[in-house]
Amino acid sequence: MSPLRLLNPQSVPVDGTDSHLPAIDPAALTATALRQRFAHPPLWTPEFEGDGRFIAERTAAQAAVLVPLVQREDRGDGGLHVLLTRRTEHLRDHAGQISFPGGRSEPHDAGPAATALREAHEEVGLATAQVQVIGLLPTYTTITHFVVTPVVALVEPMDVSALSLDRFEVAEAFEVPLSWLMTPAHHRRHLFEAEGVRRQFLSMPWQGVGSAGQAREFFIWGATAAMLRNLYRFLRA
């Protein structure tokens, strides 16, 4: 196992939060504003590109994830919610972690968007007709040797508890308000040492209710938190 992999990230001390950074203006988090942002992107640099870039154990595989922004105009928290999943504990890679729907690219996929849409349908039952892709974020290379393209999309309102989950891969699904995730005061920095080098990761612990109907803490960290932070940087640029 790579020394960069953490078996218990919750035990890594919190070095601080990024409360000094401003939250994204709610006016920039509407479906219309996001469509315009991706149609006319600014010049910007992602904050996180992934520690997998530094590991040469094997050739990295292409993958994509869907960043599903569910339209919830009836709620008073900005309207858009991010759909996330908790992976099952028996999986070889990223077991038990919070993730976006997604996975490895297949030869017949037309591109990252096709991969993300296919995987989202397989993992949580999202139909392509429910999803409108609005843009891509820069790739992120995981320590499990996947070069992941985040595909950002708007999703029609649906009942999370009624999603058709692939029970082999997905333990449960849940939503987090996009406005909450785009508030850096909720972004915690953890520091640790690996191979004599000080490294860091972000976490965004969310108290919520999953599709199983139980309230719990969802520990969003690692690649998922890094891609969300890159989305924040994209919207702040």
Regions found by a protein language model. Name each.
Residues 1-99, 104-122, 126-158, 194-237:
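N-terminal leader/linker segments that precede catalytic domains of diphosphate-processing enzymes
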Residues 165-203, 207, 214-216:
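NUDIX/MutT-family hydrolases
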Residues 161-163:
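Acidic/polar loop patches that form or flank catalytic/metal-binding clefts of enzymes
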